[in-house]
Amino acid sequence: MYWSDWGEPAMIERASMDGSARMVLHNTGLTWPNGLAIDYQLQRLYWADAFTDRIEYSSVDGTGREILLTSAHGLQHPFGITISGDQIYWTDSANSSIYTAHKQVASSILTVYGDSLILPSGIEAVDPDRQLTNSKLNFLMNLTF
């Protein structure tokens, strides 16, 4: 499991699901790290920092830390992030919007939904394979308990 902590110093950590093997991945250059998202395809951990106005990533073991997006790209207060396919999506509470861009290259930033949200925070993409289709819904509705 992975988590972020806004303490002094702010950090991003990981541990086994039973709490053992705790390890600090990042504890420098962070202030309000949040919105952790794992890209299983590339084995990367992404996060937003709402104070530094950046979206960064590293490998899931903490190596190879890189900045993907900054205030120079229009980020004002990124908070929640999620990964879907080749895209990263994030909420920005200062802009009251949801944005997307390519998860490896800071280009083609698009507004997905904008200007009518009030303090958007968390966001989660749901893989199409995990969504309920009509056949799955029919199966569930026919179950007897």
Predicted segments, located by residue:
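Short loop/turn segments immediately following the C-termini of beta-strands
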Residues: W6, A50, V60, S93, ...
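Residue position within the beta-strands of beta-propeller blades
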Residues: Y2-S4, Y46-W47, W90
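Structural motif
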Residues: P9-E13, D53-Y57, S96-A101
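A short beta-strand motif characteristic of beta-propeller blades
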Residues: S20-N27, G64-S71, S107-G114
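Short loop/turn segments that connect beta-strands within the blades of beta-propeller domains
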Residues: W6-E8, Q41, F51, S84-G85, ...
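Short loop/turn segments that connect beta-strands within beta-propeller blades
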Residues: S16-S20, S59-T63, H102-A106
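Beta-rich, blade/repeat-based domains predominating
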Residues: T28-R44, H73-Q87, L117-S135
